[in-house]
């Protein structure tokens, strides 16, 4: 049995027991079931071939599986018909058989691991047995030889001399000669003998060649090395020699090589098989032995064979050519092997050009039967013409054995013949034609329009495959070329009309190419509504319409005509045509004017210089050649001959001049005097100068005259390559303002106005003139303001002169830089579209990139300036508002979450709502409103904006009064101000709810204007007074008793907030202020600030002096001794409510301008005054430094830095936040289980719990914090320090920044807790307030009054974090004290629940987020549980503080672990 091969190519030799085990297995089968094959049947089936090297293990396994499967299928068919016991027996027997087979296979595989070693041992044993047999057989044969054949044999005498020679000398000199000659080769001949022999053999060969009849084809021979080599190029190479010098000795053919090659289809392989060469070798050798002329016979034999082989090669090349490239263009007419090959090309019937009898061009290659020694002969039918001997000679040879080259040479010659015929036709039409034929690629180059470049010539090719004409002309569409080819192939004489047609087409192409760099659109046809009746219809049909894209209503028409007796030349006529404007895009236009250009081009230029139109003149006649060249030169000397310089000049001239003509017409239509179109720069540029510009509306006659006097020149020019950009140059002299820019230092100023013409509008149309007049109006409007500003400069106050400077004035824009460092800028220019001044703000220098503080009131500044365009007044407003706005812009305006009980609603801390240029309203959390009025001399007036401006008993809808605002603002009043105030008692007890200044404002607003703004004083040369005349107190007050009892409605001057980004509730009585009148510049009510809400500010210090000449006393007004305050602070009359603010003692008021932004802690509280609900509506005067302190974020005064929170805010925010927290507290007390106690003290809230009495009020020292005063019902239960901790915690952590209502709710719930629980909470608060006192603890604690974002998700972040029912739930934040400096300290949120019934303190079991760590909560819970087990609670004792303290002392997180 052959071995078995495993998957890894290991052979398993079949081994013992297979057959016997198989037999045993088969005998155990049941009689009812078919006998299974023996277990080794699979192996036996494969072992039939004994020569097989082995069997694959996979094959054996596959056989076994098939057998098991077949037996199983048999069982499934037979078992259902048997009883249960028989079925079980059959199943057991099947399982046993199958198991036994696979066990045997397993044993075979295990045995196969050592089969290789066994096989090697068997092979060695077999080899040794064979060797033993050989030895035994040799011994038997020798014994038989000795006993039978050599019985009488005797040995010779011992060769002792030979033995002595061998043993002594090592040689055998006495070796017999017969043996020596058999085994020892003779010595080789020497090199000299070899050369002599070969030289002698060469002489013998030369003698034999001379004396032998040698064919002339074998003349190419070489004799060397005793051989002669005959070489016939392209056929064969034979090497011969002779075996002796006898002339009768025959030639010997040593080597034969066939030189026939097929370089195109042979793929480098030999064409003759080696067996064929051997046969030919034997055949030639036999001829050399027997023939009388052996060499002639050898040549004839090999030559015939090579010609037949060449013919076969050409035939195979033809078949491949037909199959791969030429197809039906070449056909095999006849092929006789070894005789001839006939091919046909240019078969018109095959090509489908003609039917019936048609000329067929044949090429025949055959062997000359008469003279076999000749090479292959080539015949052409019909015969080739003798026009070009070189082409014919090439077509009659087949040197390289290439059928394709032979065909190409043949058709090349025939193509040259066809081109000669076509050239003859052209010469019959034009005797002077100059076409040429190129022989490299058969082509006829025909010039169409002289002079003609190579790219403009018509190239006529002959397709070498089909013999058809193929045409090429650059730029001509393929469809026309196809028509020309079809017509020319049908009849060659049809080329003449096509040449005539192409001549006009080429003329059009030359015109298009000549003007393609110019703004034009060319077309051969133009849809005109009046084409038949207009003179344009009488022109030649060969014409070109050139549309000027910048002048869409004008065309240049080029007419092309024949030149008599000159078939290759054209004459051009040029016309100028104007058309009407189309109603729709698809509607045809009408031709209006058609005139021919003048005869002389220079006349056209003279017309332009004199201002006449260029579309008049007579017919323009040109020479036949637009680009004449010397006839001696080559006619196609360059492509510039195709450039029509006359047409290009006409187009460029019209494109340049017509816009000026259009502009001149528009200026004339508008009656604007000008000098017409003028030529500048030696004819390189054109311009139109205006003599006078019409006056502008809304400009005074004086300003108009001054502007006309300063204007020196106004010139219009075209700029840019597209001639669509107009530049108007204005030259001014005597500029009223000189900026700091170096460009504005000369005696004259140049202003350039640029206008872009749209593509849909004609260049130089009315639109350009209208835009210029609008710009001129803008210049005049701004010039009027600048002129007035220049007149006021000599008398401008010194502070304004230092505050501002003129940076740029270019007649279109005025840019002023202002501020202490001149880092802010304001730009003023007139907007002709909106017909008003436009103001832009910015920053320059080191401040560039920052925001201008006046951007807040930009809209109000713009409206004010448009109402009263006075630059001095604008600068005064900027001066008065810069410092307040810088302070206001520091207020936080970002919306915040969690400020109220609706934690998801964002509230804006401060909303800045500018009402006018000097009136800014601040809304705090959409509840409280503060009005800030910017006044001169560095002061502002502040009032409670919740009160109506006209009736202090009425409130603005949406706002609430801020209690204590007047007292809080008085803390920032500077006692050293020039204007003296009234007493504090009179401030809080004014004589009337309506202030005197408010009356003045209302009276002045209701009265008609009686004086112009900035009245000119005699003797000041038109300058405006910058200081108001001193007036007495009585002259500044108007008597109007009827106004005392008249209340204006609150919504008389309703307005909405101009601040769109900071949208807040917009009360109906937001009243903007009028423009300021600084330093006594009186402004009449008619010229008041025209804001979008236009009304007068009741507390503005800029109210004008009453025009009434009557003097009287205001009823109930106190008399003020000394000079009138109006002489020092304009607008501050004694009746002005700004003087009603209380003035504390000098030592009690912070001084303005001090470096400290916090109030002194030792300042005594202000004097207690009788409260008036509308006292805060009376403005309080503050300096800019005091306002900066009021609005600048600073630490909370009166608090230790450690106790103050990290949230910095301004004193105003702290005051309003404290007021709003007090308001929240009052509402919370009504909702919670607290009892409110009535209090007579204003601004004080008193309430009590079961064990405590609480008093909440603003800090009397600063009014910036809300303080809690706690008084226990049972003094023995509380220690003083515990009460102080509770009060400090309320002041710093509950009612402090950021002033959240939910912290109050949580704190009031703590106050309502039982005393023992509250005391433990107070101890925790003490650890938070004074963390340094607990140095032995590892953690700092923070009592969370609202749920932090990182807490377990039990409620939304920001909601109250204290729940007090049968159990108490609160949150603590623990922060690790020791931490690595680069890392943030580890903080964890611990929810703690205290069971009042059992007294246990545990961590609340709240599900954590999936991504949060559970290590820290588990450790916290374990520590609290261990504390509860170790310290069981006592009756009436709270364990909160003890458990928390133990947690802070024992909690240790694993290294590197974070919660």
Curated annotation (Swiss-Prot):
GO cellular component, one term: nucleoplasm
Region Interaction with SREBF1: start-end pairs: 506-830
GO MF annotations in UniProt: transcription coactivator activity
Main location per the UniProt record: nucleus
Stated name of the protein: Mediator of RNA polymerase II transcription subunit 14
Biased composition (Gly residues): 14-27
Top-level division of the source organism's lineage: Eukaryota
Pfam families according to UniProt: Med14, Med14_C, RM2_Med14, RM3_Med14, RM5_Med14, RM6_Med14, RM8_Med14
Family matches, as PANTHER family: MEDIATOR COMPLEX SUBUNIT, MEDIATOR OF RNA POLYMERASE II TRANSCRIPTION SUBUNIT 14
Stretches with biased composition (Polar residues): 1029-1059, 1097-1106, 1152-1161
